[in-house]
Regions:
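Acidic/aromatic-lined carbohydrate-recognition and catalytic surfaces
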Residues: 2-5, 9-178, 182, 195-253
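Catalytic cores of alpha/beta
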Residues: 256
Length: 271
């Protein structure tokens, strides 16, 4: 099948606000079909403050009003099915936005349920919990507002990492995936999936620059066990729906990659 990625803001604009929208993609489905496209992959269109092109999600159950409404999304899925086409969305579950309700609740009660949805560490005499450098540069640690703690973010500081070691967090992720698949979504392209497994317990590495920090890649090289998370996610979500899945993978060890792309029953995702 032939796939086409669609950055919605750069797609057809139906209301003249200068931003592409979901109704615009609906209008162009026939054209895409003529091109031989079977799968339309949408870049993030969830509600988001857009600190990182929509990869900072503040509500996994809503469409950002810049791009349309949930009714528009339902119509897009339905119209695509009429043409024997599938809609695939980006799934961003290594992190969320710092404007997500989970994170807001974590700030209010860092020792409570939602504090455990993230990687929080106490501040100790001005020393960082680890010397890891984020993909965006600088430390992966940022002060948790109103507390004496810091939170982990391997990407932008407005993208706190979700704690996949917490079963309650994983349940919320699976619940959301199934909610979308029940709507008729064809599947997901899962963003930065290799990052959901951290090397624990967290510790420092030899600095590789004068800033005293070390590339986050060093931690990923040491992390192991992502196959357990991916297998659970597959069995709880994609497999029952016979849904499409593809993962963005980088800096993975060969043995970890083998768990992701080899044939059933051990294949967790396609890459």
């Amino acid at each position: 099948r032939r796939q086409r990625q669609m950055c919605i803001r750069d797609s057809y604009d139906t209301n003249g606000d200068g931003i592409g929208d979901l109704p615009g993609i609906i209008e162009k489905l026939d054209y895409l079909k003529e091109l031989g496209v079977d799968i339309v992959w949408l870049s993030p269109c969830y509600r988001s403050p857009l600190a990182d092109q929509g990869y900072d999600i503040s509500d996994y159950y809503d469409i950002d009003p810049r791009f349309g409404t949930m009714e528009d999304m339902d119509r897009l899925i339905a119209e695509a099915k009429k043409r024997d086409m599938y809609i695939v969305m980006d799934l961003v579950v290594n992190h969320c936005s710092d404007e997500h309700e989970w994170f807001k609740k974590a700030c209010k009660d860092p020792d409570g349920k939602y504090g455990r949805f993230f990687y929080l560490r106490d501040k100790e005499d001005g020393k960082l919990p680890t010397n890891w450098r984020s993909y965006f540069g600088g430390s992966v640690w940022e002060d948790l507002p109103g507390t004496n703690k810091q939170y982990l973010h391997v990407f932008h500081k407005k993208q706190p990492d979700l704690n996949w070691e917490n079963p309650e967090l994983r349940e919320e992720v699976y619940k959301n995936i199934n909610w979308w698949l029940d709507k008729g979504l064809g599947g997901f392209r899962i963003d930065a999936i290799i990052n959901i497994k951290k090397a624990l317990p967290m510790h420092d590495y030899e600095p590789d620059r004068e800033d005293g920090l070390c590339s986050i890649n060093k931690m990923l090289e040491e992390a192991s066990g992502i196959g357990e998370f991916l297998g659970e996610m597959r069995d709880r979500t994609f497999k029952p729906h016979d849904a499409f899945s593809v993962g963005e993978v980088f800096n993975a060890k060969d043995e970890e990659l083998s768990l992701i792309h080899i044939s059933e029953p051990t294949r967790h995702l396609r890459i």
